[in-house]
């Protein structure tokens, strides 16, 4: 049988970066890891309406830097930054760190973020929208936004049937075994009348290393023209 590998974990250090950036000894490692889980869970639950795409945590001694990527950053920031200040105080208590800084960035194309797409499909399923309609709409939006490929899968008691099954739709390419391929992956859960439905989304945005090569070549050409 074929073995499945997590698309992001498979590409760490090549086209993907770590979401927690810190080092710790064996005694503190478990504690800091649990803190990271608490921070992410708290932010995602508190700002459900903001469309939280990612929470990146950096630690350096007693300093903690938290970067929140959201499709609606205004909800997290609040009026004149009041919400961010309140969030700073709460997270300082959670982490027991002396210096906590929260930065909020906007996700410019939420249609190309796998986690946000999966959550949007899950929300539609909870509102009793047809799963096929929700999946096809997400695929159309992603392809229009510039995706090179997208795969969407829904699993569970779809439509309330007795036997659980999986259904998926795909458009474009999805080179899962190509490490240089920039593939985003996200999951979500939909709580329906008949039980939990699982949603998985893969979005292929192109080859990252190829883009880097093009940028280097352009710079070389520009330098040659200036000489």
From Swiss-Prot:
Classification via Gene3D superfamilies: 3.30.300.20, Ribosomal protein S3, C-terminal domain
Segment forming the signal sequence: none
Keywords of the record: Ribonucleoprotein, Ribosomal protein, RNA-binding, rRNA-binding
One GO CC annotation: cytosolic small ribosomal subunit
KW Amino-acid biosynthesis (keyword) present: no
One Pfam assignment: Ribosomal_S3_C
NCBIfam families per the UniProt record, alphabetical: rpsC_bact (TIGR01009)
UniProt xrefs under InterPro entries: KH_dom, KH_dom-like_a/b, KH_dom_type_2, KH_sf_prok-type, Ribosomal_S3_C_sf, Ribosomal_uS3_bac-typ, Ribosomal_uS3_C, Ribosomal_uS3_CS
Role, per record: Binds the lower part of the 30S subunit head. Binds mRNA in the 70S ribosome, positioning it for translation.
Protein name stated in the entry: Small ribosomal subunit protein uS3
Keyword rRNA-binding: yes
Superkingdom: Bacteria
Gene Ontology molecular functions: mRNA binding; rRNA binding; structural constituent of ribosome
Subunit record text: Part of the 30S ribosomal subunit. Forms a tight complex with proteins S10 and S14.
Domain KH type-2: residue ranges: 39-108
An example Gene Ontology biological process: translation
Family, similarity comment: Belongs to the universal ribosomal protein uS3 family.
